[in-house]
Amino acid sequence: MPFTKSCRSANTLRKGIKNGKLILKIIVNDIDNVESCLSGDESNDSKKSSASFYMKLKYGSYRALADNILSTDENRKEDIAVFDVPLPNGLQIDTFTLCLYRKSKWKKQIVGEAYIGIQALLLSTNPDETCKYPVISPPSGRNKENQSPSHQICNLSLKWIIYDPEDADADSKTLAKAWLQQIKMNQTSIDPMSNISKSLKELEVDNVESDLEDSSFIAEPDSSIPPSESSVSISTDTGKETPPSKSKKSSNQPYVSIGEGNSDLLGFVFLEIISVSNLPPLKNVFRTGFDMDPFVITAFSKNIFRTKWLRHNLNPVYNEKFLFEVGAFESNYDLVFKVVDHDKMSLNDSIAVGSFNVQSIINSSAQVDPETGLYSFNIETSSPSQDTSSKAEDSPTVQKIADDFSSAVGKDLRTDIIEQIIPLTLCCKHDFSTPRDVKLSFKAMFFPIAALRQKFWRVMLAQYGDIEDGHIGKLGMYAVLDTLGSNIPNSMVDDIYTELSSKNHDDTSDSITVDEAVICLERLVDLVCHQDQQATQTPQSPSSNEESGPGTPTQTSDQYEDSEDSRNFPSKLYLVYLSNCPLCLKFKLSKVNQQKATVHLATCASHDWKRVDRLMMTSYVSLNQAQRRWFSKAFAKVVYGSSKVGSTSATTLVQNRQTGQIQEEKMNAYVRIGIRLLYRGIRNRRIEGSKVKKILRSLTLKQGMKYDSPISVKEIKPFIRFFDLNMNEVDMPVGGFKTFNEFFYRKLKPGSRPCAFPDNPDILVSPADSRIVAYECIEKATTYWIKGTEFTVERLLGYSNEAQRFVGGSICISRLAPQDYHRFHSPVNGCIGPITKIEGQYYTVNPMAIRSYLDVFGENVRVLIPIDSNEFGKVMLVAVGAMMVGSTVLTVDEGKIVQRSDELGYFKFGGSTVITLFEPNVTSFDEDLLRNSKTKIETLVKMGERIGQKIDPNKPTDAEDHSKSDS
């Protein structure tokens, strides 16, 4: 019997039903001329009989599969395949493909494809009416010159039905007419050929004239289904649909990755590494002289840069320039510099390391005028020295705008250049009679994103605005907006002009100054950005206007409700309505909101490619990876897996919250490989077997007994050296521990982990030194992080009566690595409730296991500690044991009143996890934790640090000041 796989197709179908979309049911009745399909390459009858056929439906990114659809049995059922396809609200792809495959024991191959147009199908046939479509064979042959042409091999018969999941009694024909009418209205609501196409056809960039003249820069109407990789053309002479032709990828085009996804962008830092002085003369292999071929690795947050290496030099001079972005939550991060010695044969050696806080660079940047909101520029951008006629003949090019802009930013913006010489700490083994004073010299500037955007407006006004005597008229502003593809009505611009001219002028002139024109464009930016924010927070009908308080940007649009032309207003306002960025030709402006679109245009135009050597090294994700040789990276790729941020591999990446650096979690190589083979291997299903469970339990208990023995004291010093632990925080000297376990759950000195905001009980603090992922609701945690197929809140809490209180609530997962301080504390003020211990297994809590099909949290041994808090309600803290964790010891009793950061217990040797559950709508986590969690990367925090706060319904939450408050 045919079936549809419950994978991506089922998820897409479920999502479509949830969003209230209509469902198109495609029923394939028959495929005639089956014998021709069966007469493939194999001539052996046994091979023919062993082959099976399946059919796949492709529609955009939607996929559905029906298996075992063809059979030589005469008693097979009439309907051989049934597919349910959610119809989009806006039609961007009109054709879906039915692919017929043949699968044998050793291989599978495509038999043919049928291309069905949705609108043509619904218009030409009635529901439950059978129609036939040809199945076209794909071209055979690897080389294009030797390929045989496609030909028809058989026909398939199908019929269709449209149904509404919310209205079972609705008629299919009525629903089809309503959907076609809606598609027609959506296609005509926004004119794709706006004035921007005329402007773009006049632009000329070297080697890309044909790409710019294409109308593909005009954004298509919004659609809930992503664009397909292929397109279907219809022959005009035969009226039949032809197979899609694969579009060629554009090559050798510059790609700008700056400013793509970070809408909360503070600005950019322009960094120039000048030189390094007084490096140590390390001996070469033959001890005949020194060997030093240094290069510098610079890291900021998730950006890694690397200079060239200079041969045999103790005072290298680089003069290499870099540019990186600074987000709103990265203003207190450190710039980390690492000097590395390049070796031809062996591994590269670390020489020295240092850091510099980026806040010092930000403080020296240009300051905004508090009254006007504008940044000061030394030279105002003037209009070109040519008349109107010559301007019409010689239209300014995109390259000229970019050159003028990038040069003007460096000259005009009043930003101080910081020149710093910082000391570096040697991290190599050396034996010198006199200490080496290694120093690094660099220059840095910070450009606020708002200043770049305002400078971009000035350049656009100068090129397109027709500035006369320092003033710009309404027609000039209309031209600028048309160039950007904006659909903002002229009446809205007229009212802003009237308001600005009445404030600063006595007459009622139709022109304003350039500064006022920049203010006008900034208001429009606030308008469209506020519109996007409201759309994401409260869904509403397109025609309804959003309520806004006094002084909000939407106040500009509300005053047009009663105007005469309000009926002509578009349902959504666009300041930038382009498909691709006309500068880098790569970034899809139509796929992002208006704030990100304006940020990208301003930053893309501001970059002077001649002054910047590199923008972003996407191949590096950490300092250690940038230091490795090619063969080390190749070995790690094969053995450990991908090292990208968010990937499920043996290389665990975490972001240090204090410095912002991406760090590789230190772990023995055999442990990495063992966990990867055990939980991510080919036969990882055997991990659920009783034998494996017994082995893990036995090893855990034996390891706990071993480290409780006095002989285990000898393991303490190698453990400290391997993980480079800071023993100055420990309350007891190393010689005072009698066993390794005593050292493992060591206490720290008082004051080593201060509680954030000690007088504010509404602040949520971290329960342990750990790597944290936090989600606003548990459903998001199962989407991004917890991949256990059987994970539920009820199973995690042992099916207790309290489980229903936390369904739909918030969750914080704090993972403790072996090198962490292994005592856990209370994150809130409250009273300890009845404690429950649940026996279970001893699986590892490494992210590789958590993000597998195995329900680690629901299977492992754990302790439930409820806390009744006046601020956060019922809070459930779950202490989860793990592989090699001997036991979980509690130091608190039931009924005890605890304050934030009070100790609750500790784990013996091994990794472990503390899960904190909150009731719905009680807690809001800090934004940096939520962002990292959505990108599947853990954040390294210390016990007592702020991680969130109580939701106050009377005032908005403020999760953006945690970094300043913690520092």
Curated annotation (Swiss-Prot):
Pathway per the UniProt entry: Phospholipid metabolism; phosphatidylethanolamine biosynthesis; phosphatidylethanolamine from CDP-diacylglycerol: step 2/2
Binding residue positions for Ca(2+): D343, S346, D349
UniProt keyword annotations, A-Z: Calcium, Cytoplasm, Decarboxylase, Endosome, Golgi apparatus, Lipid biosynthesis, Lipid metabolism, Lyase, Membrane, Metal-binding, Phospholipid biosynthesis, Phospholipid metabolism, Pyruvate, Zymogen
PROSITE patterns in the cross-refs: C2
Listed GO MF terms: metal ion binding; phosphatidylserine decarboxylase activity; phospholipid binding
Superkingdom to which the source organism belongs: Eukaryota
Protein family according to the UniProt entry: Belongs to the phosphatidylserine decarboxylase family. PSD-B subfamily. Eukaryotic type II sub-subfamily.
Protein name per UniProt: Phosphatidylserine decarboxylase proenzyme 3
